[in-house]
Amino acid sequence: MRGPGVGSGFSGERGLLEQEAGADTEAVELLPFLVLGARADLQAAAAQHVLALTGAGSGRTLLAGQPELLRALVDLAVAPAPAPSRDASRALVNLAADPNVHWQLLAADPELPARLLRCVLDPQWPWAEEAAAVLANLSREPAPCAALMEKLMAAEPERLGLERLVNALCTPSYNAAAPLHYLGPLLSNLSQQAEVRAFLLDPDRCVVQRLLPLTQYTDSSVRRGGVVGTLRNCCFEHRHHKWLLGAQVDILPFLLLPLAGPEEFSEEEMDQLPVDLQYLSPDKQREPDADIRKMLIEAVMLLTATAPGRKQVRDQGAYLILRELHSWEPEPDVRMACEKLIQVLIGDEPEAGMENLLEVQVPEDVEQQLQELDQQEQQELAQELRGNGAPHT
């Protein structure tokens, strides 16, 4: 005899298939109301419905299988009023936030990056922030990021697109209707690409120098975090460390200042610090975002990869700032990153031939041991978080 569980299972599967078929039909039926030229009130209602669908994973999966609908949505997002561009743009933001939909979006409209870039760089476009957020979401993973970069370079040859993007990022009043904070994460994601880092680190362009003040940008942690992420990625290029730490850029004070608090130092210690880090006000606040603090520490850590870099970081009193940060830091993972950097600064120099930590070849057995130690650290960190009452993840 067939048990009730089996019978209800078949019924449930049939019901689920019927629901999926109905949802597909619903998506197809929406298409005529989304195309350009459709009646305005119906078009607005259809765009709102699609926006609601993108709020759930099942809705995003459904829409990902409808390339014509995705293409119509992009057309609406870049269309002038009275088209419902805002709702269409926000639907694209939600879709692009789902990594499982990235390739479907790019396949539905291969010109999507170029079209959105034009919106982002238009000082009059009211939904430029949403367009920037779509591009930032699409560029989070390496493969879509590379595809996106290829399209951007084709749309704006000779790196003009990157130059204009940086200009918009560094000009808070670029668009009166849109703050463009998401250009920060977009540039950070794009800086995963060697070609972008080469542009940012070109001594003749002075791009990095324009980004440095934004490490203190108080109006948006999104913009600030994106810039810090960009600088951290640039610090992977150890051949540029001498230039970055030298007088032309002088990156270290910009990385350390957000990590500094109101603590007082002795006169002898104060003399070790760069001028910008001396005699800070009693109400000096550290960077409030833990993720950004960690990226700042990681950037300084990368600058210590070479022996000359370690010497410069030591000579500029980084240890003093990190010592006080470690005493204050409430987040265990950030404190751990701080500890590792302090160990590099106060530890002995590596033996001959291993001075560049980014070029050291680690044997497989040692790498496995390091991975096991890292896993052990993560487990201890998780236990500490639970002990402090943090929720389980």
From Swiss-Prot:
InterPro entries referenced in this protein's UniProt entry, alphabetically: ARM-like, ARM-type_fold, Hgh1, Protein_HGH1_C, Protein_HGH1_N
Positions bearing Phosphoserine: 221
Top-level taxon in the UniProt lineage: Eukaryota
Keyword Coiled coil assigned: no
Pfam families listed in its UniProt record: DUF383, DUF384
Keyword line: Phosphoprotein
Name under which the protein is recorded: Protein HGH1 homolog
Gene (name only): Hgh1
